Amino acid sequence: RFWNRLGARFYALDLRKYGRSMRQGQTPGYVASLDEYDADIAAALDAMRARSRGRARRSPRRLVLMGHSTGGLTLSLWAARHPGEAAAVVLNSPWLELQTGAIGRQAIAPLVAARARFDPLGTNPVVDLGFYTRAQRELGTLPDSPEGWRPERGFPTHPGWLAAIMTGQRTIAAGVDIDAPVFVLLSTRYTSPMHWAPAMTSTDSVLVVDDIARAATRIGRRV
C-alpha cells in the first residue's frame, strides 16, 4: 500500500519453496544453485508485463528491484547477469558475505562442498536461536503470516543449499558489475546472536554489518 500510494505498481515475489510458493512435501528454501531462481524472476516479470500491456504506452514504467537478505544476494547476482533489465536495485541487508567473513568462508568451503556433493540434503547445525523472531515480537513488527512460512528458529538448512549460498558470495567477492544504481541499506551496528541482548531490537543480529558493507563495494560502480 505504501508503494501504491506513491504511484508505483508493487509486486511481491515469493521465490520457490518460500511463503506462498511453498508446496506440500518440498524442502523449504532449498536450491542447489541460486541460478535456479532465474526462472522464477523471469515468470514474475512476464506476469508483470502482461498486466501492464496496453498501459505501457500511456505511462512507461521503470523496473526497480528490491531484495532482502538471501533475496538481496540473489538479486545482486541476477542483475549482474541481466544488464539493462533494471533501472535501479534496492538491497536491504543483503547477505553478500558469510557471517564468518571472507577468510572463514574460504576455510570451510572445501568441507561444505564435499558435504554438498555426497549429502546435499543432510542437516546443518542449527544456528538460529530464535532471537531474530524475539526481537521482531518485542518491536511489534513480527509479520502476521502462516506459522509454516517461517518457524521461530528458522527452517533447517542443508549442505547443498549452503554451498549454493557460498558460491554466490564467492562470485560477489570476486566482483560483479550491476549496471544500474544500487542503494544498499544496512544497520549501523552488529550484535552477536549467541545470547539474547536488548540491543538486538536496534542492531543487526544476523549479518556482520562491516563485512556486508565491504562486499557491497564489489557489486557495481554506482553503489
Where in this protein do the model-derived segments appear?
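Active-site nucleophile elbow and catalytic-triad environment of alpha/beta-hydrolase enzymes
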Residues: 153-174
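Active-site loop signature of alpha/beta-hydrolase-fold enzymes
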Residues: 18-21, 97, 192
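Alpha/beta-hydrolase active-site loop
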Residues: 30-51
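Conserved loop-alpha-helix segment in the C-terminal half of the alpha/beta-hydrolase fold
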Residues: 191-223
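Alpha/beta-hydrolase fold nucleophile elbow
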Residues: 53-69
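Short beta-strand/loop motif that positions the catalytic acidic residue
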Residues: 178, 184-186
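Alpha/beta-hydrolase-fold enzymes
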Residues: 68-70, 74-157
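Conserved alpha/beta-hydrolase
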Residues: 2-24
